[in-house]
């Protein structure tokens, strides 16, 4: 009973420490953060008053906890970081002390259009940045490496794991997802906690570290979005404040509703059914908040800031492209555009370049395939293009996952309107072309019909129907498929007719020999609709897909010979089905130990959709032995307990992780540094000062000291990964049958059950 009472007292003491320190981001994790949070609270209080509200951290925390009970998730850091609303700025930004001071005083400063961090002291001096991991499992590390490769592919920075630079990034499993803005010196933390495990969120936090603020904090944001103030959680209105020239710079780039740095539509909402951000053009509503990866504009911001001197000369890029710092011989083009100088449509196996005429023409996507990536460019030189959708059929999501994107603005840098839920009204281009992009996710379910649209020329010098080739329907099976590190090419994919029949790679689609110009022409990747008099033109099976030449081949510019050539004969697709190419391998089911497996799948198309063999392929993976936990962690700790109680308790870990940590034996309670809950003096000291010591009081004090001396304390030393915002110690009574020395190997086996390690590799018994 006495031991149980002592255990309750110890647990109560630990619980009291936890209650007093409710912060999720401790001051020793981020330098000077206690002072930063005081300034941040003053900033939130100031902005709450502008809306007639008070800043009540307890009320905000209660709303956040209630929201966490919801299964809703917008796939942004906003969902994960609800409990951090009082700890961070704009959901995921860790401010430095100078930034916080500037933030509090900026409301009276002149405003200008700004968005990237302008202080040269926060710029990265080199284009190679060191990074390291601070704990975390291997699958988590691989995700971060994939996100870093994704960033590297789009900007001129290179990242070196475990590099020796003094300044760098340290990714660790903290509470939530957060980062500093710009370089702050030393190994600055980037927290990728549980729930932040996506390529887009890791990229988002990395771009913060490179110097980008959130997109919706730009001064010109009111031209593109409106803030629904009455839907925002009271007291968090300061998270919608706009930046000024004091701490950000737009670098002359337009506002991008598809930026990976943009808030989602429901950020800081007190009710998940409510939007706190509405786009001025409602067709963009499901575009904001995407976390698929960097947009063209996101990368252009970084490259404009850091990479303008990488190449010796600038290329004459079109359509707002710019010289690619990773390949100085080409331009980096906005989505939808391709070619050396961004003069053509982006190369895909489905889609192409089309010219509008005075009468409507039709584009049908067909059934949306997984990883579909198709791009069309519709032109009307000297005029505009009108687009009218008859069907938009995708899985509705906020933001869109699979979608049709329409770029109809005169500026090309920004992301287009992504449609997946609603049918838009008539769209008219601001310039002389429109870009249509079809995207499908890797896990797109079969059955979504995609989109159907019709287009025509408005103004300009439209071509009459008599001078153009028949209307073309399209397919959605890509030659290119998306991976975590970018788009990769699939050799010899199956070719499709509009009715869904398939031409496999070993079938000749036509006996007619085409010229090399025709094979390069994007129009040869299109097949006429069923109303056309001409049969499908299909790429011969022995020809490898080629990228378009530098000069774009428009349908209206085909030679007369091409328009009048004899109708080619085609081989009718057999009634039997055929397999598609294998998809990518899944992640391994185990990080090590020998028993892991990975799988890949393929689809059966055409005919009766019955193909020989299995659609599933399985392979063993990660046969290497599991590494034992390393000793020598950064921080040591100790727990003070009565010695007779300590011997009866089990702990969540053991000291086999570090044999150097031994129990240090007995120690007098008067010399032990007990936890300091507050700055108040002990109660019995106050009593001594206020009242003269009586005989009764002295007798009581003597008995108390005797009890403490007889009940000597022992210390339980332990190690833990630090910095940490929350340290949990698990204790329970040992079962009578349990020994005191658990085998280290039993707790941390090198191989799975049924496998034996030999020279670092696990083999099946």
UniProtKB/Swiss-Prot annotation:
CDD domains: CUB, ZnMc_astacin_like. Its cofactor is Zn(2+). Pfam families: Astacin, TSP_1. Disulfide bonds join 156-307, 177-196, 311-331, 333-342, 350-374, 400-420, 588-621, 592-626, 604-611. SUPFAM superfamilies: Metalloproteases ('zincins'), catalytic domain (SSF55486), Spermadhesin, CUB domain (SSF49854), TSP-1 type 1 repeat (SSF82895). PROSITE patterns: ASTACIN, CUB, EGF_1, EGF_2, EGF_3, TSP1. Residues 303-343 form the EGF-like domain. Residues 1-22 form the signal peptide. Binds 1 zinc ion per subunit. InterPro entries: Astacin-like_dom, CUB_dom, EGF-like_dom, MetalloPept_cat_dom_sf, Metallopeptidase_nem, Peptidase_M12A, Peptidase_Metallo, Sperma_CUB_dom_sf. GO terms for biological process: collagen and cuticulin-based cuticle development; ecdysis, collagen and cuticulin-based cuticle; molting cycle, collagen and cuticulin-based cuticle; proteolysis. Residues 576-627 form the TSP type-1 domain. Residues 526-545, 562-573 have a biased composition (Low complexity). It is an enzyme of class 3 (hydrolase). Residues 115-308 form the Peptidase M12A domain. Expressed in hypodermal cells. Not expressed in the seam cells in L1 to L3 larvae, but it is present in seam cells of L4 larvae. Also expressed in attachment points of the cuticle at the anterior end of larvae, in the arcade cells in the mouth, the anterior pharynx, the amphid socket cells, and in the rectal epithelial cells at the posterior end of the larvae (at protein level). GO terms for molecular function: metalloendopeptidase activity; zinc ion binding. Glycans are attached at residue 126. Metalloprotease. Plays an essential role in molting, a process during larval stages in which a new cuticle is formed and the old cuticle is shed. Required during ecdysis, the opening of the cuticle to allow the worm to escape. This is Zinc metalloproteinase nas-37.
């Amino acid at each position: 009973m006495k031991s149980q009472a002592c255990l309750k007292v110890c647990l109560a003491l630990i619980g009291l420490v936890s209650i007093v320190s409710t912060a999720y981001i401790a001051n020793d994790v981020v330098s000077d953060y206690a002072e930063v949070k005081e300034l941040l609270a003053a900033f939130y209080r100031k902005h709450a008053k502008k809306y007639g509200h008070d800043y009540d951290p307890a009320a905000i925390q209660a709303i956040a906890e209630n929201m966490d009970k919801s299964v809703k998730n917008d796939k942004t850091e906003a969902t994960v970081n609800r409990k951090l609303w009082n700890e961070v700025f704009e959901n995921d930004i860790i401010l430095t002390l100078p930034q916080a001071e500037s933030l509090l005083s900026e409301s009276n400063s002149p405003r200008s259009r700004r968005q990237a961090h302008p202080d040269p002291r926060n710029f990265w001096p080199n284009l190679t940045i060191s990074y390291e991991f601070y704990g975390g499992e291997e699958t988590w590390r691989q995700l971060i490496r994939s996100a870093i490769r994704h960033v590297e592919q789009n900007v001129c920075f290179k990242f070196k794991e475990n590099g020796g630079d003094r300044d760098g990034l340290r990714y660790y499993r903290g509470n939530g997802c957060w980062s500093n803005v710009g370089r702050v010196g030393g190994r600055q933390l980037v927290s990728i906690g549980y729930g932040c495990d996506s390529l887009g969120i890791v990229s988002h936090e990395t771009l913060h570290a490179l110097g980008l603020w959130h997109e919706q904090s730009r001064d010109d944001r009111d031209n593109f979005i409106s803030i629904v103030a009455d839907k925002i959680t009271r007291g968090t209105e300061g998270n919608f404040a706009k930046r000024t020239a004091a701490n950000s710079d737009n670098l002359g780039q337009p506002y991008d509703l598809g930026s990976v740095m943009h808030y989602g539509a429901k950020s800081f909402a007190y009710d998940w059914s409510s939007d706190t951000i509405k786009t001025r053009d409602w067709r963009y509503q499901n575009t904001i908040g995407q976390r698929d990866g960097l947009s063209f504009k996101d990368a252009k911001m970084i490259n404009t800031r850091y990479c303008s001197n990488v190449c010796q000369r600038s290329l004459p890029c079109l359509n707002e492209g710019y010289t690619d710092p990773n390949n100085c011989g080409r331009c980096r083009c906005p989505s939808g555009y391709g070619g050396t100088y961004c003069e053509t449509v982006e190369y895909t196996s489905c889609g192409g370049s089309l010219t509008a005429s005075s009468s409507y023409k039709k584009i049908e996507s067909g059934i949306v395939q997984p990883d579909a990536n198709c791009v069309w460019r519709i032109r009307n030189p000297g005029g505009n293009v009108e687009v009218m959708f008859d069907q938009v059929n995708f899985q509705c999501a906020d933001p869109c996952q699979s979608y049709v994107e329409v770029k109809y603005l005169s500026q090309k840098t920004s992301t287009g309107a992504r449609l997946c839920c609603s049918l838009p009204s008539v769209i008219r281009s601001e310039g002389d072309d429109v870009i249509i992009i079809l995207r499908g996710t890797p896990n797109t379910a079969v059955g979504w019909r995609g989109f159907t649209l019709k287009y025509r020329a408005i103004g300009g010098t439209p071509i009459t129907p008599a001078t153009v080739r028949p209307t073309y329907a399209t397919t959605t099976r890509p030659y290119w498929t998306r991976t975590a590190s970018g788009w990769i090419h699939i050799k010899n994919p199956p070719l499709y007719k509009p009715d869904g029949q398939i031409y496999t790679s070993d079938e000749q689609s036509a006996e007619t020999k085409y010229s090399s110009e025709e094979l390069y022409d994007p129009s040869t990747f299109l097949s006429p609709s069923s109303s056309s008099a001409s049969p499908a033109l299909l790429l011969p099976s022995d020809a490898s897909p080629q990228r378009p030449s530098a000069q774009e081949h428009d349908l209206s510019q085909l030679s007369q010979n091409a328009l009048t050539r004899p109708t080619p004969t085609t081989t009718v697709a057999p009634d039997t089905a055929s397999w598609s190419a294998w998809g990518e391998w899944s992640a391994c089911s185990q990080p090590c130990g020998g028993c892991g497996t990975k799988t890949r799948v393929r689809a059966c198309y055409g005919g009766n959709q019955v193909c020989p063999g299995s659609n599933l392929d399985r392979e063993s993976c990660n046969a290497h032995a599991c590494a034992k936990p390393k000793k020598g962690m950064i921080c040591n700790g100790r727990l003070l307990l009565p010695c007779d109680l300590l011997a009866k308790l089990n702990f969540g870990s053991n000291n086999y992780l570090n044999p150097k940590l031994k129990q240090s034996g007995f120690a007098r309670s008067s010399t032990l540094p007990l936890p300091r809950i507050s700055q108040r003096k002990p109660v019995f000291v106050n009593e001594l000062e206020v009242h003269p010591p009586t005989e009764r009081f002295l007798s009581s004090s003597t008995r108390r000291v005797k009890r403490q001396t007889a009940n000597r304390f022992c210390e339980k030393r332990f190690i833990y990964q630090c910095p940490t915002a929350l340290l949990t110690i698990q204790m329970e009574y040992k079962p009578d049958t349990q020994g005191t020395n658990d085998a280290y190997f039993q707790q941390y086996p090198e191989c799975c059950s049924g496998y034996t390690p030999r020279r670092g590799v696990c083999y099946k018994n």
